Amino acid sequence: MLSIIQRVNCANVVVDGQKVADINKGILALVCVEKEDTHQNFEKMTDKIIKYRIFEDEAGKMNLSLADINGEIILVPQFTLAADTKKGNRPSFSSGCPPEIAKEKFKKFVDIFKNKYDKVQTGIFGADMKVSLTNDGPVTFTFKV
């Protein structure tokens, strides 16, 4: 399981001209489920994102988590994170999870996340999404669990 998280002042996702997710201060997370991912991976990634201290405290130190600031999050499915880019000039997705399986795994991940944190919105799996954000910092991290 892969994720890129970005600290944002605001972010939104639009599909077919309709805003499907819209947050203020929090995290925009691009999330990729892989073939071998299990419930344990989903739990670990959820805990990592919720507890990772990327927000500044009163001293200006990155010492507060999403939960600490009561921030919002958008989970955006992003299968291209699993691309093999080592050879040539075109990404390979041969090791990726088939779409129907990936969609179900992403749903399970979102369900786990929503059970642990209540300010969760999502993009739409398989949709052509327009993602907008105001990055704060920028502060961006990559996770693999």
UniProtKB/Swiss-Prot annotation:
Record field: transmembrane: none
Intervals of motif Gly-cisPro motif, important for rejection of L-amino acids: 137-138
Taxonomic superkingdom: Bacteria
EC number: 3.1.1.96
Molecular-function annotations in GO: D-tyrosyl-tRNA(Tyr) deacylase activity; Gly-tRNA(Ala) deacylase activity; Ser(Gly)-tRNA(Ala) hydrolase activity; tRNA binding
InterPro entries per the UniProt record, alphabetical: Daa-tRNA_deacyls_DTD, DTD-like_sf
GO CC term (a single one): cytoplasm
Assembly mode: Homodimer.
Family in the record: Belongs to the DTD family.
Protein name: D-aminoacyl-tRNA deacylase
Organism, as annotated: Francisella philomiragia subsp. philomiragia (strain ATCC 25017 / CCUG 19701 / FSC 153 / O#319-036)
